[in-house]
Swiss-Prot record:
Entries under InterPro entries matching the protein: GTP_cyclohydro_II, RibA, RibA-like_sf
Protein's UniProt name: GTP cyclohydrolase-2
CDD domains: GTP_cyclohydro2
HAMAP family, per the entry: RibA
GO BP annotations listed: riboflavin biosynthetic process
Cofactor: how bound: Binds 1 zinc ion per subunit.
Pfam families to which the protein is assigned, alphabetical: GTP_cyclohydro2
Binding site for GTP: R52, M53, H54, S55, E56, Q73, E94, G95, R96, T116, T151, K156
Stated role: Catalyzes the conversion of GTP to 2,5-diamino-6-ribosylamino-4(3H)-pyrimidinone 5'-phosphate (DARP), formate and pyrophosphate.
Cofactor needs: Zn(2+)
């Protein structure tokens, strides 16, 4: 059974001015070092906390890549939760689970005209290899059974529900369209059935 390993205060956001806590876990399904970032002690102060499962994206989260909207979604969520409280489950699932180097290979194929899903398939991967079991385990370790989920992705909604987490409300993120990511976002809508207006 998963449990909280450590819980430490820190400040986050573009200006490091938003109070939060970072939590590590033990007993998760794999040895991936997933973390939770909690704002305003939402795990104890909110009966049904706002939760976002955010899969690691080095290129978007750290380098603000033009190819995706991951960094903007993360920043939007941090700012929202900094004001109203909530929990980010930061999952080490780079490239929808294919890993960083394979994602870079997929970028090369996208530059040649494939969309994000076609590129993954061409490399021998399914559309999305992520498994959200550990996100459910993290919520269980925090004693959370009901959430308001911040997502545009129906797979996240479906899988968390299958793992016994009751999703009381779905809160969509904004569409963060910029030069270089419009075809990526359109593929997420047409192929991945994401709830986005692009």
């Amino acid at each position: 059974m998963a449990e909280v390993r450590a819980r430490v205060d820190f400040k986050v956001g573009a200006k490091s001015n938003i109070d939060a806590e970072i939590l590590s876990f033990r007993g998760l399904k794999t040895d991936k070092e997933h973390v939770a970032v909690i704002f305003k002690s939402a795990d104890v102060t909110q009966e049904v906390p706002l939760v976002r499962m955010h899969s690691e994206c080095l290129t978007g989260d750290v380098f603000h890549s033009s190819r995706c909207d991951c960094g903007e979604q993360l920043e939007e969520t941090i700012n929202r939760m900094g004001e109203s409280g909530g929990i980010i489950l930061y999952l080490r699932q780079e490239g929808r689970g294919i890993g960083l180097y394979n994602k870079i290979d997929a970028y090369r194929l996208q530059s040649e005209g494939m969309n994000t899903y076609e590129a993954n398939n061409h490399l021998g991967f399914d559309d999305d290899l992520r498994d959200f079991t550990e996100a459910a385990q993290m919520l269980e370790a925090l004693g959370i059974k009901q959430i308001r989920l911040v997502t545009n992705n129906p797979k996240k909604i479906r899988e968390l529900s299958e793992y016994g987490i009751e999703i009381v409300e779905v809160v969509n993120t904004s569409a963060h369209i910029k030069e270089g990511n419009e075809s990526y976002l359109k593929a997420k809508v047409s192929h991945g059935k994401h709830h986005l207006k692009v």
